[in-house]
């Protein structure tokens, strides 16, 4: 089943939410009161989501720079 342009845009927006969450956790601006285990789990889940999504074959002109940066930062993160 092919995705519509709207569905692809929604996927890209969701990826942006994961990028923001990963970045904010690493910067200490999100989940500050959570345990290291919870922060690590959240980063790991969001990195996995981004890795799965960036591998999709329906992307065209979307800029994945921030996504790739968040994947790298998340993979290097230890809470």
Please describe what each predicted stretch is.
Residues 1-79:
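Beta-rich interaction/scaffold domains
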